């Protein structure tokens, strides 16, 4: 049997691995699936079609899988899917998806999600991200791997935040943030590259040189976005170690629908 506190309410039909622990007064709905090694804190609520992978730690009063805050929602059986080894701190709220998108809100693996973070319907959060206290993702936001979002930052609907990007405290993000960039403020502005983050992740100097050249093309040479993208196509010849990073950046820019922070 799972280690379930006697005051917790686990509905018939819920699927809990035998190694799951559930704290006092937690409420788990009939469609929840909770994988091995998960810890559900006191007073947590897990409802709807919510699936958690292995070894997630959910702190007290988090609410996962509630209906999307979308007036068009009419009770469709949408989902919230969370991967493995995530830390989800107190009072976080993650909503299920809507049928206007994929019907799915998804969160990957190894994310560090601090207190009071809100992840709205249809968001896609990658792996190894950090979302600091009170960060708020509106509907359909995409946050790529290893991005960092500062506390009290608000992210507009449909915005994409690229891999390795970093947003400072209390920023207002209404346009897409390209990979590797560091942004801050209200109004938001690019402050440079997230160099310290890249160094901590072991990026060698030769690879960093290619990323710096992409930054110059986007932000320091007065080029249009189209011209900067075309110029980037030539970078792998001079910076072969950054070829994958160039491909990542060009794919991100091609997929932008809200324009980028410039």
Swiss-Prot record:
GO terms for biological process: lipid A biosynthetic process. It comes from the Bacteria. One of its GO terms (molecular function) is acyl-[acyl-carrier-protein]-UDP-N-acetylglucosamine O-acyltransferase activity. Involved in the biosynthesis of lipid A, a phosphorylated glycolipid that anchors the lipopolysaccharide to the outer membrane of the cell. It is an enzyme of class 2 (transferase). This is Acyl-[acyl-carrier-protein]--UDP-N-acetylglucosamine O-acyltransferase. Gene3D superfamilies: Hexapeptide repeat proteins, Udp N-acetylglucosamine O-acyltransferase, C-terminal domain. The gene is lpxA. Its EC number is 2.3.1.129. Keywords: Acyltransferase, Cytoplasm, Lipid A biosynthesis, Lipid biosynthesis, Lipid metabolism, Repeat, Transferase. It is found in: Cytoplasm. Pfam families: Acetyltransf_11 (PF13720), Hexapep (PF00132). Pathway: Glycolipid biosynthesis; lipid IV(A) biosynthesis; lipid IV(A) from (3R)-3-hydroxytetradecanoyl-[acyl-carrier-protein] and UDP-N-acetyl-alpha-D-glucosamine: step 1/6. Belongs to the transferase hexapeptide repeat family. LpxA subfamily. Homotrimer. HAMAP family: LpxA (MF_00387).
């Amino acid at each position: 049997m799972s280690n379930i506190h006697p005051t917790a309410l686990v509905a018939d039909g819920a699927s809990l691995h035998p190694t799951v622990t559930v704290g006092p007064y937690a409420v788990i709905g009939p469609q929840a699936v909770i994988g091995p090694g998960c810890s559900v804190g006191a007073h947590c609520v897990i409802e709807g079609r919510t699936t958690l992978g292995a070894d997630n730690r959910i702190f007290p009063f988090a609410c996962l899988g509630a209906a999307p805050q979308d007036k068009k929602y009419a009770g469709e059986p949408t989902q919230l899917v969370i991967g493995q080894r995530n830390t989800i701190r107190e009072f976080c709220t993650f909503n299920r998806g809507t049928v206007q998108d994929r019907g799915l809100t998804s969160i990957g693996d190894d994310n560090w999600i601090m207190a009071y973070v809100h992840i709205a319907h249809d968001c896609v959060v990658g792996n190894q991200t950090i979302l600091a206290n009170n960060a708020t993702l509106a509907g359909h936001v995409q946050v790529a791997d290893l991005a960092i979002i500062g506390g009290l930052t608000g992210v507009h609907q449909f915005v994409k935040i690229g891999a390795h990007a970093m947003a400072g405290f209390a920023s207002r993000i209404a346009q897409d943030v390209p990979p590797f960039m560091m942004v801050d403020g209200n109004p938001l502005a690019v402050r440079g590259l997230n160099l310290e983050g890249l160094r901590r992740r072991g990026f060698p100097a030769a690879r960093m040189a290619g990323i710096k050249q992409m930054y110059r093309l986007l932000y320091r040479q007065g080029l249009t976005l189209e011209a900067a993208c075309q110029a980037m196509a030539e970078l792998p010849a001079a910076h072969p170690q950054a070829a994958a990073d160039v491909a990542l950046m060009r794919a991100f820019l091609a997929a932008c629908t809200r324009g980028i922070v410039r």
